[in-house]
Structure formats: C-alpha cells, structure tokens
Regions:
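Eukaryote-biased detector of low-complexity, proline/serine/threonine-rich segments
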Residues: 454-497
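The feature marks non-catalytic terminal segments
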Residues: 22, 32, 185-388
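Short acidic, glycine-rich surface-loop motifs adjacent to enzyme active sites
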Residues: 152-165
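Active-site rim/loop-helix segments in enzyme catalytic domains that contact anionic ligands
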Residues: 20-151, 173, 177-184, 188
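Short beta-strand elements of extracellular/lumenal beta-sandwich folds
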Residues: 407, 411-426
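Short, solvent-exposed loop/linker segments at the N-terminal edge
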Residues: 390-394, 399, 404-413
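Bacterial N-terminal signal peptides
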Residues: 6-19
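Short acidic, flexible loop segments centered on an aromatic residue
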Residues: 424-441
Length: 497
C-alpha cells in the first residue's frame, strides 16, 4: 500500500524533522539503497552531543551513518544565537533560526537521522564553566539532556567535549560535563520522575565517550573518517565538510577538502558493560555490544520471549537476501525481499507488544524497511498547493510553463492541492489510497478523475484535492519555543498547534 500524506511534523522538546528537505543525490538510487541496506543490518545507534551548531564532528557522523549503517542522532544544546553572522544583519533569536536551518542542511550530509535541541540559549562567549551553569542551571540542562536520551534511546553516547578547560567555551564545557552525568541519570527512573509520569521510560545507554583526545594521550577508540567512500565519491570527512560549508552564517561557505587519514581519538569514560567485554583499546564504539538484529533482546538486556528468535531470524534472512540481490543497475531487485522483511517486522511488532523496548527498535526497523523500499523503487511524490480550479498546461511548451502562483491563504479559504506519485522500479505497485492529512478543522475532498491503481513503471499518478482552512486557523505560524525577555537564558516551550 502506498499512502501519501501531507501534514506537520511533531516537535518533541527539540526534535527537528530532517525529512522536510529534498534528498541528496547520494541518498537516492543505487547509492541511497545500499546505505539503507546497511542500516537494516544493524541495531547500532549513537547520540553525538555538542553545544552549538558547527561544533559537531561531522566526519565521524558521516562515517557512522553512511559507512557502518548505525543510527545517528545529534543533540545540540543551543542554536548559536550569540554567534557572528557573516551573511546579514540578523542576530540573537533571528540568527538562532538561521543557524538551526543551516545545521539541518548540514545534517543531511552527515547522515543524521534525528536532530535535537534543548531549551537553553546561547547567551554569549564565556570561558568559564561556572558562568554557564549559573546562567542555565545545571539541573535544567541535565533534565533536558536526560529527556532527549530517553526519547531517542541510543546504545552509545559520544560527547564532542570533555567537560573541562580544554573545551574552551563555557557552553562547550557544560555539554561535556552534562553528557557524562546524563549517561547514568537517564537510566535511573528516580531522576526526573515527572518524565516517567509523562510516558517516557528510563533508558540506560551502554557506553559513553568523550572527544578531543590526542594521539599521545589515554584514548580508547581511533576513528578515521578520511576513508574513501565509493558511494559518496569522496571521503566521509570531505562529504561532511561539504555539509559544514552550508553553515554559511559562520564560515561564509568556505570549503577545504583534504585527502588522507583524518584520525579522531575518543576516550571511554563510563560503561555498564562488564569489564570482560571491553578493553583499554577498542576497534569501534560497539566493541562488547552485539548489534545484530537477532541479538535484540540480549543487547536490550531483556528476557527473550518464546518464539522471538525465529521472528528475528526471519527478518534478518530477508535483509541478507535483499543485500545479496542488490544490483547497481536495478536496485529494485532487492524489493521483494525487503517487502518480506517489512511484513515480518510488522508481525514481530504485534507479537512483542508487551516488550516496549524491543517494539521501539522494531518500529524503527519498520521505518527503515519502508525507506529502503521507496528508495530502491525510485518512488517520487510531490504535493503542490495552487489556486482552486488551476488547469494543467498543455502543448509542446507545457514542460516550460511557470508554476501556478499561490499567495498566502486566510482562514476559511479554499485552495487546491495537486499530488503526483510515480514508482520507477521494476516490481509493480498497487496504489490503495492517496490521501491528505490536514489540520484540525480543515476539510479535504478529492477532485478530478481517478487514475490507474496499478501504474506502470515511471507512470505518473495524480490526484487533486480541494482543501478548506478552518475558520479559526491561525493567521501565521510560530516557533514552539519563546522567551519573554532578551535576558532570559532558556526558552519556554509553547503549544504551536
């Protein structure tokens, strides 16, 4: 079933929807399909923590996500509101919005699966940790970080900073300090119990690392994002630098690529794994952790229910068959196996309903299967708002016709949404429904002639909908966060619905 929806992404504390952007070429076709197959083969997950946009170790993120298939999330304490602006006059909150969008753009290159922010505000440059803790309140920062860890539920935390004077900026030191403390706090249901009452569950990551170590110091893991990726056409570090160059308010778009190793050194500072499973030196962040899907319950430290192993093995077999059938010339050759894996995953989700931690990871796998299928099939979809009654251009110059002009809409106004869908893979698809998900009080009704329900490869299927805004729809959108006064060092979350 292919169901297309249009709507607003849910923002939880500071979760930003990266899917709002058009995919990069490297995330489509054969390259994109292969990278999504890598993600299906593992349950590895990492959360990288920083203080500001552009602090992140982008090469590390790109290597983890695109090179190993790990799920990668990025938690950035603030939005860099007190930085400089190389592009224009916007400063403070306005600059924070610009830097947020720049980071989300860069995240595409890093391969970040989820971007989070806390409620703290960049109040200006400070070399002192105590000033940052005084401005923000350590417990406030810790509460936000624990909430994000409990929301994302990563296996490993990797802090960009160490939490000491080597980090320089007081914001940097706070990010390092709080990450290490949040490692244990997130797994303790007695810490911030109001989050548990809201429906979150305590979550204990398995290991936490700090960055910024040097080759001649005590380090645990050495990573080389300078490795060349034939799927990207450059190294992971260079691909990440392309993303970093889009944070133009800070770097004016400068881009410097460099071949060769790009080593980064990270030190493990805490773990809940037994000493026998880890060593002074590790090859990866996941040494001592079985990241195969069949080991899901073992890795989650949960008793495996009867029949679970057979279900997990069925999913894994489907993934491995999809990998073996993968073809650069026809990525959709993997789709039949992926479809079986998706069905098996959905069955497992239903079977393990009493195991919420396992269901959480399996529902993530369900989404990964859907993404892999859509990418392998070359699925494209677009929904365009236009004035009601707009007709499609015809004739030999139709492809060069300008798009219809759609001005701002007001409460109670009716307009049209034209949805176009195409699947360009070899397997046939059947369209059960194309629908719009609209806002509260809005109405949407189908219009236009019905198209084929089993289109040929690359055949475009269109649907038109008449949409009427609610009479009490807000006249403008607004962020889900605000501060009452410029002196406030933390945002208040508001209902932006």
């Amino acid at each position: 079933m292919k169901t297309l929806t249009a709507g607003c992404a849910l923002l939880v504390v500071g979760l930003c929807a990266l899917q709002a952007y058009e995919p990069l070429p490297q995330d489509t076709g054969a390259s994109g399909t292969w990278q999504k197959l890598l993600k299906l083969r593992t349950i590895a997950s990492v959360m990288h923590t920083t203080a500001h946009p552009d602090d992140e170790h982008g090469g590390l993120l790109a290597w983890l996500s695109r090179g190993t298939g790990a799920r990668v999330s990025l938690m950035t304490l603030n939005r860099g509101q007190s930085g400089d602006n190389a592009l224009g006059p916007q400063l403070f909150d306005g600059l924070g919005l610009i830097r947020t969008e720049e980071l989300l753009n860069a995240d595409q290159y890093y391969g970040v699966d989820a971007q989070y922010f806390t409620t703290v505000i960049d109040y200006g440059f400070s070399k002192r940790l105590d000033e940052a803790l005084d401005k923000w309140g350590k417990e406030n920062v810790l509460r936000d970080v624990v909430r994000i860890i409990r929301t994302e539920r990563p296996l490993v935390l990797v802090s960009r900073f160490q939490g000491n004077q080597r980090d320089g900026h007081g914001n940097h030191q706070t990010a390092g300090l709080v990450t290490v403390e949040a490692f244990r706090a997130a797994g303790d249901p007695k810490r911030f119990p109001e989050q548990i009452s809201e429906g979150l569950r305590a979550w204990q990551p398995l290991k936490v690392y700090i960055g910024g170590a040097r080759e001649d110091e005590d380090w645990t893991v050495r990573v080389d994002p300078g490795q060349y990726s034939p799927w990207l056409g450059m190294s992971y570090s260079d691909f990440a630098r392309v993303g970093l160059s889009y944070q133009r308010s800070q770097n004016s778009g400068r881009l410097a690529l460099a071949a060769g190793p790009q080593y980064g050194y990270y030190k493990r500072v805490d773990t809940v794994l037994p000493a026998s499973s880890t060593g002074a030196r590790e090859k990866t962040f996941f040494d001592g952790i079985d990241t195969s899907l069949v080991a899901l319950f073992k890795t989650l430290r949960r008793t495996e229910p009867a029949g679970a192993q057979a279900r997990l093995e069925a999913i894994s077999r489907a993934v491995e068959e999809a990998v073996s059938r993968f073809s650069i010339q026809d990525p959709s050759a993997s789709v039949p196996a992926l479809a079986r894996g998706l069905a098996a995953t959905r069955e497992a989700v239903a079977a393990f309903a009493s195991e919420p931690d396992a269901v959480f990871y399996l529902e993530r796998k369900e989404t990964e299967f859907e993404d892999a299928i859509n990418t392998a099939m070359g699925v494209t979809q677009a929904a365009v708002a236009q004035p009601a009654g707009t007709t499609d251009p015809t004739g030999p110059a139709a492809g060069f016709a300008p798009p219809p002009v759609m001005g701002p809409v007001v409460p109670g106004q009716t307009f049209e949404v034209r949805v176009a869908f195409a699947s360009r893979g070899t397997p046939k698809v059947a369209i059960d429904e194309i629908a719009l998900a609209v806002g509260k009080g809005w109405t949407a009704s189908g219009a236009g002639a019905a198209a084929a329900t089993a289109p040929a490869s690359n055949e475009v299927v269109t649907r038109r909908f008449n949409v009427t805004l609610a009479a009490d729809a807000p006249l403008s959108s607004k962020p889900y966060f605000e501060r009452k006064a410029f002196q406030d060092a933390r945002y208040q979350l508001v209902d932006a619905s």
